Structures are given as structure tokens and as C-alpha cells.
Amino acid sequence: MNLNDLYKKVSAIPIGDFPPSALSGLLHGYISVYSIVRVNPWLEDVYGSQWDIHERIREIAGELADLIQDPSVTLEDRVGHIADLMEAYLTYSDMDFLDIALDAAYGIISPEGRDEIVLPCRTPEMCRLLCSCYYFTGEERCAELAGEIIKERGTEIFNKSVEEPLENRWNWYRAEEFYENIIGEEKHEKVKNMLMLEEEFWKQFGKDIDSKDLTVSTLCFDNLALKEYSLI
């Protein structure tokens, strides 16, 4: 299944039918497709109008905003939803969504309004959250802590002897890419690494892409859409 086929599949499904675990891949896939169409307007014939894609991103942002405010959501999942909602704002500029995301972010990293930033987890999603906080507030400490997480990840890879799940590696790739784009550090071999991950994606998930597992479908959608945009 290529990007066009997968795009048709996910676009035919109402946003509310996707499980929370599928929203991040779905959002990033649509952001990449939006960027593709913005650069190449004639591809609206393939992917629909920029407005249509924009509306899907808005709907995903609405789901994320609800999840962020749901007390039953675990802390690590909430961190991921906050990071995604702030990234959605970069395409769909709704200040209400940004306010929800920033309030929730600082409620986690600066509880009770403390001056010191604390990190309850050091996940790729936390790295993206910190990058967005730096982008929107200019708080240097957020950039420093995001950099520390990226460096720790490099050390962890060097010392790791056990293979980690592919989904986790993709989440780290996304975090590293976002860090490089926002903080502006030296770029790594991003396209090469992405293509290597794409090959592994299809080895592991290719046989399940036509299944009803929407989390798998949106992961592959994210991967294919980013590849297509990176090769423009």
C-alpha cells in the first residue's frame, strides 16, 4: 500500500473513531501532507484542498485538547498529547488550543507555579514538549533540558544491547527531528535514518496495514507522508 492508498483509507474514517494511541501518527501524517500540498498545489487533485486537510488537523487538535483535560489519562500519555497539540498549532493557529497546551505543559514541568522546571519523565514526547515551550515562550531552560534528553538518548543507544520496539525508535526519530528544527542544532543524517526506519516499518507492519489496527495504519501513514515531504 502506497501513501495515496493509505491516505484514502485514513481520510475515510471519522476522527472520533481513532483511538488516542493513533492520533499522534495521524496528526503528523496530515501535517506532512499539508506541507506537500502547500509546496505543490497541483497535488490537491490527489490529497484534497489545503482547507480540507486543515480541517482534519483542526479535528485532531480538538480530540487532543479533550484528552489533555481528561484526568484519567496517564501522565506520559498526557505529555504526548500536549506535545502534539502544540505542534498542531504550528499549522492550525487557534490560540485557545495553544493556551490549553501551554497551561497543561507548565502544570507538569512547573507544578504550583515553581520557578524551577522539573521533568517527571524523559521521554521523546517530553523532549518535543520542551522544544515547543521554548519556541512559544523563549524559555532557555526548556531548550537546555530538551538538549539533555537528546544527549542521553545518544548515550543510551551506544550502550544498549537489547533491540527496542520500532514504534519507540520512530518516536525518538520524531523528537530528534523536532529538536533540530526548533533549537537549531547541527543536523544528523535524517533522511538516511528515516529511510532505514521505513524499510523496517514495512517488514514489521506491512502485512497488517490492511487490518483494523488504526494505530499501525497511522504510524505507517506518518512514516510515508514524512518520507514524501522530505524528498520534495
Model-derived segments and their meaning:
Residues 1-16, 25, 29-44, 48, ...:
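Terminal, non-catalytic domain-edge segments
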Residues 2-5, 52-59, 103:
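Helix-turn-helix repeat elements of alpha-solenoid scaffolds
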Residues 16, 20-23, 54, 75-78, ...:
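Inter-repeat boundary and helix-capping residues of tandem alpha-helical solenoids
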Residues 20-38, 43, 59, 77-90:
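Non-membrane alpha-helical segments in proteins
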Residues 42-62:
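Aromatic-lined substrate-binding rim segments of carbohydrate-active enzymes
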Residues 58-76:
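Blade-loop segments of beta-propeller domains
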Residues 73-89, 114-136, 164-180:
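Aromatic-lined, polymer-binding surfaces characteristic
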Residues 104-115:
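Asp-box/WD-like beta-propeller blade repeats and closely related beta-sheet repeat scaffolds
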